[in-house]
């Protein structure tokens, strides 16, 4: 089959895409076009939804002449039914997912694309041949630090660290309080103005006394700044930082080990973004990060508060920051480039178009 038209079923709209839709789909579309593939968006919800009603999407795919349909992060009864309807109509299917295992979706589609080797490993052995890894591509490969500073950090002239998160953190994980010679800027999902103050009041009201005291200490700590994420500001903050932090609270798996906790299935996206900027990174070791960082060479791993203190102290040396930052960038820019990931995705699309699985 000569494949030309590829349909997409999305879990968020093009007008307001969630990060996974932007990175896994919209960033890939120009590369698909260059490869002679014509993308067609068959479905996009007004509000993000992983379990939308996909009735009539199969008919739309057939009407528009789609040879293959990619289902991005959608799952549930309607998504499984759609995959089966497409198969019955002779249309190949690919399930694109970044943060969970869904055996019914994997079984209903011709191939599954996941973002990490670890997420692939969580699937049953009998399904491994259907599962392919396409990482999140680095979105701003040109953005890079040009100055790693000459200071070692003092109380009066502290070094600057940046932590980029998709959450509205109410504490600095693991580290808790930065040393006197370091300021930390947390770029996250923070509200602004009156909405921010309302959120603080609501958070304080629901906390227990001990938690409330810790939160108040976090709020008044002059060495910690919390700012809202935006697509330009996040790169500005990273460019101004001396060090990047990714502290993750690795809580015990309350499910008894049958389901991996959310922190374990995180992609390496935030890590490679910071490394591509040329930042020396200290991170909590999680499965996806362990395949990227060579401890002490292109980044640091830290588990305990003591580990974090030792790694932070090592990066007070400006020469070490520069050396590690440059090594970090060199190790990820090609391997995790959008071009490289698009090549992998196109390879899967073409392979599925030529065979059953």
Regions found by a protein language model. Name each.
Residues 110-145, 149, 160-165:
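Donor nucleotide-sugar binding/catalytic pocket of nucleotide-sugar-dependent glycosyltransferases
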Residues 231-276, 283-291:
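Nucleotide-sugar-dependent
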Residues 20-23, 28, 141-142, 148, ...:
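A charged, aromatic-enriched C-terminal amphipathic alpha-helix characteristic of glycosyltransferases
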Residues 43-128:
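Extended catalytic core of nucleotide-activated donor transferases of GT-like folds
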Residues 268, 293-306, 313-319:
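Conserved acidic donor-binding segment of nucleotide-sugar-dependent glycosyltransferases
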Residues 16-30, 34-35, 140-141, 147-240:
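Conserved catalytic-core segment of nucleotide-activated headgroup transferases in glycan assembly
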Residues 1-71, 75-79:
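N-terminal pre-catalytic "stem/leader" segment of glycosyltransferase-like enzymes
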């Amino acid at each position: 089959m000569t494949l030309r038209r590829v349909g997409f079923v999305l879990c968020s709209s093009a007008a307001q895409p969630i990060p996974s839709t932007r990175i896994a789909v919209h960033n890939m579309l120009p590369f698909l076009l260059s490869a002679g593939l014509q993308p067609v968006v068959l479905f996009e919800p007004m509000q993000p939804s992983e379990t939308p009603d996909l009735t009539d999407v199969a008919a739309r795919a057939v009407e528009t002449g789609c040879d293959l349909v990619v289902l991005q992060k959608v799952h549930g009864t309607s998504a499984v039914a759609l995959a089966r309807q497409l198969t019955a109509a002779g249309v190949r299917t690919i399930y694109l997912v970044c943060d969970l295992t869904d055996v019914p979706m994997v079984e209903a589609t011709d191939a599954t694309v996941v973002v990490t080797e670890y997420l692939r490993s969580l699937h049953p052995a009998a399904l491994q041949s259907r599962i392919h890894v396409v990482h999140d591509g680095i979105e701003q490969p040109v953005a890079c630090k040009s100055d790693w500073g000459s200071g070692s950090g003092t109380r009066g002239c502290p070094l600057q660290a940046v932590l980029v998160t998709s959450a509205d953190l109410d504490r600095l994980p693991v580290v808790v309080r930065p040393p006197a010679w370091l300021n930390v800027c947390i770029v996250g999902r923070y509200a602004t103005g009156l909405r921010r103050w309302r959120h603080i009041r609501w958070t304080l009201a629901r906390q227990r006394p001990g938690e409330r005291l810790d939160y108040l200490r976090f709020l008044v700590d002059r060495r910690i700044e919390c700012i809202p994420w935006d697509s330009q500001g996040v790169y500005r903050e990273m460019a101004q930082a001396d060090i990047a932090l990714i502290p993750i609270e690795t809580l015990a798996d309350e499910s008894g080990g049958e389901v991996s906790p959310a922190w374990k299935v995180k992609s390496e996206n935030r890590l490679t973004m910071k490394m591509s900027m040329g930042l020396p990174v200290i991170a909590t070791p999680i499965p996806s990060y362990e395949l990227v960082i060579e401890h002490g060479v292109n980044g640091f791993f830290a588990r305990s508060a003591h580990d974090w203190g030792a790694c932070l102290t090592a990066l007070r040396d400006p020469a070490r920051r520069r050396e590690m930052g440059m090594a970090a960038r060199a190790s990820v820019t090609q391997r995790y480039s959008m071009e490289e990931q698009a090549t992998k995705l196109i390879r899967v699309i073409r392979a599925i178009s030529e065979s059953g699985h």
